[in-house]
Amino acid sequence: MNRKSFIKFLALLPITGTAMKLNELNKITEPFDHTDKMPVLFLGHGSPMNAIEDNEFVQGFRKVGEEIRKPNAVLCISAHWETKGTFVTAMEKPKTIHDFGGFPEELYKVKYPALGNPELAREIKENINKTEVGLNLNWGLDHGTWSVVKHMYPQAEVPVIQLSLDYQNSPQYHYELAKELRSLRKKGVLIIGSGNMVHNLRMVDWRRLDEVDYSYDWASEASEKMKKFILSGDHQQLINYQSQGKEFSLAIPTPEHYLPLLYALALKDKNDGISLFNDKAVAGSLTMTSVKITTR
């Protein structure tokens, strides 16, 4: 419910009487509560196995969860939910989606029982003007979300919802759409983009999967350029990644793992600080580089 709708709603209430209990009113106004501005994250989520391993990347996810104050909710834009149109999950209890194959049975047994937040989903729907946002009751939490958030909030005490990636639209479109989510930072919502900056599965060196900081030359070159643009605030170069040459073409053969980075960067305010963590490559053609945007 947006502010205009809320005011109209109040006008319909009896001036006296008990048509609405106080806790019900609080529930409706809760999305309007303002807090100190939350950080924004882009997380290089890597292999689903990170959900059950305890490696340096997992330790990085855990540490960033400890460094920032606990949010009222998490909104995640995951590489693994592409749709025709834009949707936000709006169920009370999102299911844990095991959207992968060929991994140990232990991984398929993992459940992340975080609640959803239908009220937040409705607020997002009503406040985004760039496109119509649908409320989705079928998806849940895919591994781009739960495999990293479970390390940040292992007790699953923070509600989590997802916003889908509309595969029909351009990087510029996604960047502009993300800007419409800015107000959520002041309402206690932690916004996370989850993907990988360099992500070319076809060129993975399967013999060196466990060798951290191993990358092909083209992957290193693309990664260094990306980091330069990120830290300098030159977002337009990142939006126009398809014009950046062969290294970027190899690093981003398909856009779904890259677009969540643009969502995070679009949410950066002028006076915010920005830093990198988990800044290493794996398997030759993947990077785990993650981004943290914070108030100064």
What are these regions (language model features)?
Residues 121-175, 180:
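Internal, conserved structured core segments that host functional sites
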Residues 57-67, 172-187:
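Long, well-ordered alpha-helical scaffolding segments within enzyme catalytic domains
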Residues 21, 25-132:
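A short aromatic-anchored loop/beta-hairpin motif
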Residues 1-14, 27:
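N-terminal secretory signal peptides and thylakoid transit peptides that target proteins
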Residues 14-20:
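Hydrophobic h-region of N-terminal signal peptides that target proteins for export
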Residues 107-115, 137, 164-171, 248:
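Flexible, glycine/proline-enriched loop segments at strand-loop-helix junctions
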Residues 39-44, 73-78, 163, 184-197, ...:
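Beta-strand elements within well-structured catalytic alpha/beta cores of enzymes
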Residues 126, 130, 158-159, 169, ...:
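Surface-exposed, charge/polar-rich loops and edge strands
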